[in-house]
């Protein structure tokens, strides 16, 4: 997770700031202030005019200059409603207060002022966001708002019209001007207000309300639509407004604007730059509208002349004087900062004065670039000596006594850590960059094992779920962390030391002073040299203490993991036609294959130990594999071997594993394009296979991109994402940014892939033609660098709140299922309506089978679904596979899949072969007549029905086992069947006792021009010597193809 202390976006600079965790620049999205989007985010005029709306409208190009002595032709007047025609702004705020009072939330009418003129949804939702109202339902709140407002405040003929409103509208019509109401309110409120004000709807040539628009004021869409309906050019329209959003919308639409002071002061309005300002609508004359008036409230001729002389064009196309740019820019900065602070409060809570100072001038540390030679350690020794002599180093605060510890008893600097060199690792377990540095810390711990040195992990949570001690304990177990870890959930140590990014290391001296502070990954050498220098310097001062710390490793206190068949399983895949479930048994470093009822079939990677090795199923090794994708055509399984930074391929025909990309080293290439293992990868977390073009799409969590591997040419390259860790939806790969994508699934039409963008807590759709993306649910749709918009709220689109989703799956019917991992829930997303609903889970981590609403999971991750609607879930922290029958609707239950025959891995030699001798659940057992001759040739002939042939690519094979092992010598013991499906085995019985030979065959065959199929058959041949004569018995068998729903195994296409 490339996260730093978040700051409001600049509207001027195109600054690039360095991400401390990924060491790639994070660009601050910067556009000149023109108007705001629906939620108040300031965007450029160009951007806004290109944004999609439900009603298609277009603006005229603004004139290059405005004549200073001519107001210009006026053909239409567009009246805002609230605050202009109707004295309803205060009434609206009072109705909104009533809504929140009913919810038990204390608010005041002033809380709603910043959101006036932006539409009811934002009007209510903005305050709900600021007040941190959990479970806020904007649709329900909006409905209740209208009920209260219409019933209590806006009764017909209640006299809410401003004095002079009726007269001015009438006078405009008498002058031949067209008049329209153009309001950000919904039509129901517009009609009610006009009636309450005594203004007949028939007075107006058009009434344009919020219902038909995606973008409300300050976007120009409503005004542009009104002009289009009236048939009047935008340059001939005059707008009357009371809100900043309205003034800005008028400017964006190239319309003159008269502002009234019914809501805001003249000073605030003047900064927005309206054409003129009046107290209220009763003070606007027809002369003001037709000629622009003549008093000081209109922009003066001198100022207009100054603007004409000093016209400058900004990089974003804004034309105006330097004064205009400064004026509008200052207003934009102010309002952007207010909105940013309100919507990014979770990010802002990590700030501290010291963090801001460190972000500006840098924390105290030696230079790591000046000397890379042999004298580097001595350079750091000299630096430490200078630091101690000046006594300028920061003292590390003591750990608060209330903090919980893992892997150790509570530690204190003045007691346990005194006399030791300490690295404080500020981390949060969701962060991919924090995972990347764990091998560096392990290296240091091993190198300085017998010395007065230790690492202390200071867990400083980003997500709410990460503050839970049990969740952190599971992370410690999952990543095999053996050093002490403290749960600093309230960020005390973080703030005191001014930390502003994950991960950050503080190297602390034996006397509790900060020697160096280093942010980001890739600093093994720097940390190693600083620690070596510290041990050298303080060793010479005789202040080191080698007393061991009181360790108590969590892995030694959790017996369940020692006997569990699975250990933190990550992802799933299904071979529906072959009745197989693939499980990435991540912390056992293997892939498990069962049938759909949980019966063991085979394992790939037998030792359970971390490794990186190709070869047979027994010899192959993985390192915490995650994503899986099945290629039915070739009977291959693609594996995202995450901590080997590799893409692996499991070949079930030849029972081999090979590496397709990556070589075990973490890469930093953001473009790719190399072939095979020459192309390095960076923490691939999930994969999906696109069969038409034969591409494997990779969710590259480590560098926030989507990559593709071509099966046809073996080249791996970036597909989408510029590598910046952001939540940015663009139209091209270069303008799109992801934030630790951790799940990927193809849509049924293969036109889009769906992404679980975990760090932005959003679900996004990736266009497989253009490489661009769009938001479906969750995340912050406006501030791309705000990765702190998370929670637990069902709803539609951006109102949805998720918490670090890790898995996504699109079913054949187009419905999307997702694991809302840190909310411990399974949810469903309709990609058309963008509505998200909870299917299962309570929101609290736990384990409980039963009805979906009451059942509990613990950080679920991977998903897979069968054709008959059984949804499998990798329940990661429970180390279980769960499933839901989706056909039962509200009566659905979460049940636990019983894994029969799946054992924890064992490092014993040939353990895999022993397991494979057992017939799998899909094997047909054929018992044949006894063989009574001492010696002979056993002929095996397998035939197929008409219309089928043996596969030429996937050769059928056999393997022979005998019980007892040495009772019969059979040669060969394994091999392939002939193209006609036959083989001959020579046998010699060495014992007169009865024995059994088992000939296990894997038969691959195809129907002409259709799918290819697979059948597992085991022939049990009894042996007993009754004759010394030689014989050549024959075993015949005809394969009977089985339908998919009967469990028959099918392979798409190998012919």
From Swiss-Prot:
Mg(2+) binds at residues 80, 82, 242. Disulfide bonds join 431-434. Keywords: Acetylation, Chloroplast, Disulfide bond, Hydrolase, Magnesium, Membrane, Metal-binding, Plastid, Repeat, Thylakoid, Transit peptide, Transmembrane, Transmembrane helix. Residues 346-1055 are lumenal. GO terms for biological process: nonphotochemical quenching. The modification N-acetylvaline is found at residue 57. It is a single-pass membrane protein. GO terms for cellular component: chloroplast; chloroplast stroma; chloroplast thylakoid; chloroplast thylakoid membrane; nucleus; thylakoid membrane. Disruption phenotype: High light intensity-dependent and irreversible nonphotochemical quenching (NPQ) due to a decrease in chlorophyll excited-state lifetime. GO terms for molecular function: hydrolase activity; metal ion binding. Its EC number is 3.1.3.-. SMART domains: LY (SM00135). Residues 359-536 form the Thioredoxin domain. It is found in: Plastid, Chloroplast thylakoid membrane. It holds the Pfam family NHL. The chain crosses the membrane at residues 328-345. Substrate binds at residues 80, 89, 118-122, 141-144, 183-189. NHL repeats lie at residues 565-597, 611-647, 673-712, 802-832, 854-887. The active site is at 80 (nucleophile), 82 (proton donor). The keyword Metal-binding applies. In the N-terminal section; belongs to the HAD-like hydrolase superfamily. In the C-terminal section; belongs to the thioredoxin family. Required to maintain light harvesting efficiency, especially during nonphotochemical quenching (NPQ) recovery, via the regulation of chlorophyll excited-state lifetime probably by preventing the formation of a slowly reversible form of antenna quenching. This is Protein SUPPRESSOR OF QUENCHING 1, chloroplastic.
């Amino acid at each position: 997770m490339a996260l730093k202390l978040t700051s409001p976006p600049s509207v001027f600079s195109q600054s690039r700031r360095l991400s401390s965790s990924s060491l790639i620049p994070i660009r601050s999205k910067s556009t000149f202030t023109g108007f705001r989007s629906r939620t108040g985010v300031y965007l450029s005029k160009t951007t806004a005019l290109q944004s999609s709306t439900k009603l298609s409208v277009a603006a005229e190009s603004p004139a290059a200059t405005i004549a200073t002595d001519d107001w210009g032709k006026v053909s239409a007047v567009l009246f805002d409603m609230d605050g202009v025609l109707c004295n309803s702004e205060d009434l609206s705020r009072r109705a909104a207060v009533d809504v929140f009072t009913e919810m038990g939330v204390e608010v005041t009418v002033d809380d709603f002022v910043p959101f006036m003129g932006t539409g009811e949804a934002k009007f209510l939702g903005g305050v709900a966001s600021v007040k941190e109202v959990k479970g806020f339902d904007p649709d329900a709140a909006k409905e209740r708002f209208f009920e209260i407002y219409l019933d209590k405040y806006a009764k017909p003929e209640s006299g809410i019209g401003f004095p002079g409103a009726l007269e001015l509208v009438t006078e405009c019509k008498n002058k031949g001007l067209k008049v329209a109401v153009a309001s950000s309110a919904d039509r129901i409120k517009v009609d009610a207000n006009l009636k309450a004000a005594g203004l007949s709807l028939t007075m107006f040539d058009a009434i344009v309300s919020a219902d038909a628009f995606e973008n409300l004021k300050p976007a120009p869409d409503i005004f542009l639509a009104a002009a289009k309906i009236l048939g009047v050019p935008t340059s001939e329209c005059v707008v009357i407004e009371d809100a900043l959003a309205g003034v800005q919308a008028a400017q964006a639409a190239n319309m003159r604007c008269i502002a009234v002071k019914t809501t805001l002061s003249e000073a605030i309005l003047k900064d927005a730059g309206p054409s003129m300002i009046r107290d209220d609508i009763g003070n606007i004359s027809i002369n003001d509208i037709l000629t622009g008036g003549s008093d000081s409230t209109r922009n003066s001729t001198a100022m207009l002349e100054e603007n004409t002389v000093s016209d400058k064009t900004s990089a974003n196309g804004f034309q105006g004087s330097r004064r205009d740019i400064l004026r509008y820019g200052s207003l934009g900065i102010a309002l952007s900062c207010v909105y940013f602070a309100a919507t990014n409060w979770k990010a802002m809570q990590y700030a501290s004065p010291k963090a801001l100072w460190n972000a500006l001038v840098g924390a105290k540390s030696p230079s790591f670039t000046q000397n890379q030679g042999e004298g580097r350690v001595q350079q750091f020794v000299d630096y430490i000596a200078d630091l101690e002599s000046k006594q300028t180093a920061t003292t590390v605060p003591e750990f608060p006594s209330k903090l919980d510890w893992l892997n150790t008893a509570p530690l204190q600097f003045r007691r346990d850590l005194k006399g030791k060199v300490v690295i404080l690792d500020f981390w949060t377990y969701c962060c991919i960059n924090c995972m990347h540095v764990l091998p560096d810390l392990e290296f240091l711990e091993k190198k300085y094992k017998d010395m007065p040195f230790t690492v202390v992990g200071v867990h400083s949570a980003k997500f709410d779920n990460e503050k839970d001690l049990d969740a952190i304990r599971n992370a410690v177990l999952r990543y095999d962390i053996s050093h002490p870890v403290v749960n600093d959930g309230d960020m005390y140590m973080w703030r005191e030391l001014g930390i502003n990014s994950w991960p950050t290391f503080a190297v602390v001296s034996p006397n509790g002073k900060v020697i160096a502070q280093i942010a980001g990954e890739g600093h093994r050498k720097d940390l190693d040299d600083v620690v070596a220098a510290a041990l050298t310097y303080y060793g010479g001062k005789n202040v080191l203490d080698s007393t061991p710390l009181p360790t108590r490793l969590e892995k030694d206190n959790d017996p369940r993991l020692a006997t569990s068949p699975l250990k933190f399983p990550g992802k799933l895949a299904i071979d529906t036609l072959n009745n197989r479930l693939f499980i990435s048994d991540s912390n056992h470093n293997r892939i498990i294959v069962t049938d759909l009822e949980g019966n063991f079939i085979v394992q790939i990677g037998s030792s359970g130990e971390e490794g990186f090795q190709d070869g047979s199923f027994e010899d192959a090794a993985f390192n915490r594999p995650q994503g899986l994708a099945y290629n039915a055509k070739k009977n291959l399984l693609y594996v995202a071997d995450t901590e080997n930074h590799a893409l692996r391929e499991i070949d079930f025909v030849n029972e081999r594993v090979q590496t397709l990309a990556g070589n075990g080293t973490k890469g930093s290439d953001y473009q790719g394009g190399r072939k095979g293992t020459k192309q390095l990868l960076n923490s691939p977390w999930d994969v999906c296979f696109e069969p038409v073009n034969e591409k494997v799409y990779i969710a590259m969590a480590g560098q926030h991109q989507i990559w593709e591997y071509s099966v046809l040419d073996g080249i791996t390259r970036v597909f989408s994402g510029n590598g910046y860790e952001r939540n940015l939806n663009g139209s091209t790969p270069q303008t799109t940014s992801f934030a630790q994508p951790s799940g990927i699934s193809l849509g049924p039409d293969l036109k889009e892939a769906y992404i679980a963008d975990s760090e932005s807590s959003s679900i996004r759709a990736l266009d497989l033609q253009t490489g661009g993306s769009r938001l479906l649910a969750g995340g912050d749709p406006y501030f791309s660098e705000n990765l702190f918009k998370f929670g637990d709220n069902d709803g539609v689109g951006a109102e949805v709140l998720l918490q670090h989703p890790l898995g996504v799956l699109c079913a054949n019917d187009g419905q999307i299922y997702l694991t809302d991992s840190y909310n411990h829930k399974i949810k469903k997303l309709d990609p058309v309506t963008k509505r998200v609903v909870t299917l299962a889970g309570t929101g609290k981590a736990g384990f409980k089978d039963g009805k979906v609403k009451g059942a509990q999971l613990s950080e679920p991750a991977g998903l897979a679904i069968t054709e008959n609607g059984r949804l499998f879930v990798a329940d990661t922290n429970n180390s279980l596979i769960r499933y839901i029958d989706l056909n039962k609707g509200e009566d659905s239950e979460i049940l636990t899949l019983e894994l029969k025959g799946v054992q924890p891995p064992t490092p014993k030699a040939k353990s895999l072969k022993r397991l494979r001798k057992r017939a799998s659940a899909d094997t047909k057992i054929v018992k044949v007549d006894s063989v009574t001759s001492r010696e002979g040739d056993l002929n095996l002939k397998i035939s197929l029905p008409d219309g089928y042939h043996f596969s030429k690519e996937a050769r059928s094979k056999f393997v022979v086992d005998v019980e007892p092992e040495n009772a019969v010598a059979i040669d060969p013991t394994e091999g392939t069947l002939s193209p006609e499906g036959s083989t001959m085995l020579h046998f010699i019985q060495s014992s007169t006792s009865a024995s059994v030979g088992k000939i296990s065959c894997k038969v691959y065959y195809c129907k002409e021009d259709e799918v290819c199929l697979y059948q597992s058959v085991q022939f049990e041949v009894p042996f007993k010597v009754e004759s010394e004569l030689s014989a050549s018995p024959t075993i015949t068998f005809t394969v009977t193809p089985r339908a998919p729903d009967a469990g028959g195994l099918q392979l798409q296409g190998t012919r």
